[in-house]
């Protein structure tokens, strides 16, 4: 039988199961005497996104900042110890690496430069009643996180997402385009 060729610019179908498995939980413990413990707490939870086959996980930095213990929570609930690889003060991103194999496929990377106001996206978290939510980019503008970083072109989306810390911002074709940080009122 004949098949019609799909145009080059048509996005590939999204495998939501694959995306959901690439978004994991991050649990950290921070000593009470650290600079950030009072404001951010000593037990922090967030999301992380598997970005390579060696257990490298991208998250938002405040989840891991000053942590002395890090666990990655897999989709099946199993906790895998991890080590902090780095924290980028320019972007506010953090990286951790699993000590044991995760045996999970990494997410495909996209280009956040392709996002502009009006674009539809998905926000994906590790947990919650609704781990996936449709959203829309409302603007790209500067963001000053006085405690951490300054972004020239932060991505602002609506509606607000309850499990935002380290959540994956997914674009057309199922590619990672951003990492959730916080909810702002404007």
Question: What kind of feature is each model-predicted range?
Answer:
Residues 2-49, 53-62, 69, 116-121:
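N-terminal activation segment of mature serine protease catalytic domains
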Residues 3-16, 104, 123, 129-133, ...:
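C-terminal cap/linker of serine protease catalytic domains
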Residues 15-16, 85-86, 147:
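Short secondary-structure boundary/capping segments
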Residues 22, 26-37, 41, 99-106, ...:
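Active-site region of chymotrypsin-like
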Residues 31-33, 52-132, 154, 159, ...:
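Conserved active-site neighborhood of the chymotrypsin/trypsin-like protease fold
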Residues 48-50, 82-84, 137-139, 169:
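Conserved hydrophobic positions within beta-strands
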């Amino acid at each position: 039988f004949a098949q019609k060729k799909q145009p080059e610019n048509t996005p590939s179908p999204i495998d939501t199961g694959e995306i959901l498995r690439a978004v994991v939980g991050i649990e950290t413990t921070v000593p009470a005497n650290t600079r950030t413990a009072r404001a951010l707490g000593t037990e922090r939870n967030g999301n992380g996104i598997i970005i390579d086959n060696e257990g490298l996980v991208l998250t938002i930095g405040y989840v891991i900042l000053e942590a002395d213990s890090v666990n990655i929570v897999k989709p099946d609930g199993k906790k895998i110890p991890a080590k902090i690889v780095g924290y980028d003060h320019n972007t506010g991103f953090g990286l951790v690496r699993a000590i044991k194999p995760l045996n999970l496929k990494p997410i495909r990377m996209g280009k956040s430069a392709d996002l502009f106001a009006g674009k539809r996206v998905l926000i994906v978290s590790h947990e919650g009643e609704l781990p996936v939510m449709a959203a829309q980019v409302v603007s790209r503008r500067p963001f000053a996180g006085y405690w951490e970083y300054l972004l020239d072109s932060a991505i602002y989306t609506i509606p607000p997402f309850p499990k935002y810390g380290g959540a994956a911002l997914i674009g057309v074709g199922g590619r990672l385009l951003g990492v959730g940080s916080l909810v702002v009122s404007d």
